[in-house]
Amino acid sequence: MSESPYTSGTTHFGFRDVAAKDKQKLVGEVFTSVARNYDLMNDLMSLGIHRAWKRYFVATAQVKPGDRVLDLAGGTGDIAVLLKERVGNEGAVVLGDINAGMLSVGRDRLTNRGLVAGFDYVQCNAEALPFPDQSFDLVTISFGLRNVTDKDAALREMYRVLKVGGQARVLEFSEVTADWFKPIYDFHSFKILPKLGQLFARDADSYQYLAESIRKHPPQDSLKGMMGEAGFARCHYKNLTGGIVAIHSGYKI
């Protein structure tokens, strides 16, 4: 079983070792800083491909009209909008995020587009969700799990609030599978991305952290094992774009 950072007392914040109790605050500062430029951040990190990844992530999810869905680390609401299209007028999407700034941006964007009915917004910590057991037919988290301090706790909470028969899905930057591409990817991540962050968002440090956080995230097989330890069955993953990102899925049976 992977070690909880609360057991060891320290965890990583990018490539830095920090006290586990401090990581949530540090991550919060990063996302408060980038909230208004979050879509730009994803465009810079993925060269714009994140939009296709997200569409595929939702299109292949186990969800049907009338379902109730929780989207964690919901950010600016782009995944929530796609999920609402899947669940229809009879369904509901709860957009959860620990960061009030991100949640506010998401709420404002959806409201300005006239997307009000069927959406709820909850500021919540993925490690201790404020929902009863078996509340949702589908639980998703995209580009958020790597920023959680205690990932094992978050996966257990996703399992707890999922209904029997439901699916949990994780979309996250992962480990590149092609050896020839790794130097190119590293160069973009550590040399180009922070400079782009400084140029377009006046915030090189946050973009440096985000690049580092990807390298510290568990690789594909490790995360699959963590999902199994959290209780999920039929765990599997699919690499996209050569492993730059991966979609992990598990079921509550």
Swiss-Prot record:
Superkingdom to which the source organism belongs: Bacteria
Keyword Ribosomal protein: no
GO biological processes: aerobic respiration; menaquinone biosynthetic process; methylation; ubiquinone biosynthetic process
Amino-acid positions noted as binding S-adenosyl-L-methionine in the UniProt annotation, renumbered to this chain: 76, 97, 125-126, 142
Catalytic reaction equation(s): a 2-demethylmenaquinol + S-adenosyl-L-methionine = a menaquinol + S-adenosyl-L-homocysteine + H(+); a 2-methoxy-6-(all-trans-polyprenyl)benzene-1,4-diol + S-adenosyl-L-methionine = a 5-methoxy-2-methyl-3-(all-trans-polyprenyl)benzene-1,4-diol + S-adenosyl-L-homocysteine + H(+)
Pfam families in alphabetical order: Ubie_methyltran
Keywords (A to Z) from UniProt: Menaquinone biosynthesis, Methyltransferase, S-adenosyl-L-methionine, Transferase, Ubiquinone biosynthesis
GO MF annotation list: 2-methoxy-6-polyprenyl-1,4-benzoquinol methyltransferase activity; demethylmenaquinone methyltransferase activity
Pathway listed: Quinol/quinone metabolism; menaquinone biosynthesis; menaquinol from 1,4-dihydroxy-2-naphthoate: step 2/2; Cofactor biosynthesis; ubiquinone biosynthesis
UniProt keyword Methyltransferase present: yes
Enzyme Commission number(s) of this protein: 2.1.1.163, 2.1.1.201
InterPro entries given in the database record: SAM-dependent_MTases_sf, UbiE/COQ5_MeTrFase, UbiE/COQ5_MeTrFase_CS
Enzyme class, spelled out: transferase
HAMAP family linked to this entry: MenG_UbiE_methyltr
Similarity section: Belongs to the class I-like SAM-binding methyltransferase superfamily. MenG/UbiE family.
Biological role stated in the UniProt entry: Methyltransferase required for the conversion of demethylmenaquinol (DMKH2) to menaquinol (MKH2) and the conversion of 2-polyprenyl-6-methoxy-1,4-benzoquinol (DDMQH2) to 2-polyprenyl-3-methyl-6-methoxy-1,4-benzoquinol (DMQH2).
Protein's UniProt name: Ubiquinone/menaquinone biosynthesis C-methyltransferase UbiE
Organism: Xanthomonas campestris pv. campestris (strain ATCC 33913 / DSM 3586 / NCPPB 528 / LMG 568 / P 25)
